[in-house]
């Protein structure tokens, strides 16, 4: 039976979430039913639908003791809200709550959720600290029960010297023989992150297997939101480092990076060959993947970052959204990303302009809007820079500028409408092709997702611009030749 705390959350969201009209939400990005969303959790395919749970505070548009919100979809674009799945209502999690986790299917057809359970505990010096453990909940896709054995993983299961204060974000899966495996992140004895592997025969009784990878203070400090999966003949360990220093393609603060390498299942040894940044934009964190029934590896993420969560639209009834899910592949040793192909199925009216010469600034007939799938191809040329302005009017725009001499693509939302002192500009390197560049851009009211050169690089950002600012403009220093294709979306 649902607890009083869970029933209260369900009643609140049913009343207040239903009062938010579809027009107040993005067209094809998932938002919380009401209130606050951060990390997507439990991204999975179960009983014929994609399930996306999420870190959730239904009562306000800011972080507070965590619940798990819940939504399902058949196409990864249209999301149906289900009742709140988890609340901080058990002895293992009745402090800051039910933190991030994941989902898998059990042999009896039930769905197993594994999450970080957090309680506040008084330390010998009198200080209150949050203790992080891992717990489970078992259900039918709608209601979930927490067994009395929780928590199922605690500090005693970690190697000596690892912290009980930073031990979180379990990502669970089933091996071919039915074994349950889970990777978590934890703070090692050197004060930096590590990814630890545990296994279980039944999902209840777990044992430590190995440390898959250590930060060694090379990639930030503490790690978050790990994932470990095979992809196109390689093995990927994806996670979110905190407190990164800018170096190469990595930027300050929270990043999402992927180690690409090989995994020996017999010895549980992961050998990395390459590491890359997963998104060069501003708002992208807390990734999680699932395997679709057709074999695609699909990734979701929080379309936000912690540094700008206080910059909210005035009077908003919800805050936080997830990205349009992306298909992952490996090309030339790196992960490339593409919007899920389900987006193609909702393409509507097509507007096409071929081999247009751009000198100075111009706009093109029919190319405008805040909900669209836009592709801009710039041909090789002698131009000195090319700029695309999105969500534009006389006072606002967000720009993408390409410098062919440095192969640098810059996303700038300085004029998007925010009044806060947050990050507005990010740049990333794209593959040099003598000035050639292909950009696919997903627009959805308050978000922009950019896929450069068929997803070799991506850049993601939340924008704060009035919806009336729907212009799109093209500008070049010199002479650039572009082909533009835009699809309206029938959602």
Regions found by a protein language model. Name each.
Residues 1-169, 174-218, 230-279, 303-353, ...:
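Beta-rich carbohydrate-recognition and catalytic domains
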Residues 10-15, 260-491:
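Beta-rich accessory regions
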Residues 229-230, 479:
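Juxtamembrane/interface motifs at transmembrane-helix termini
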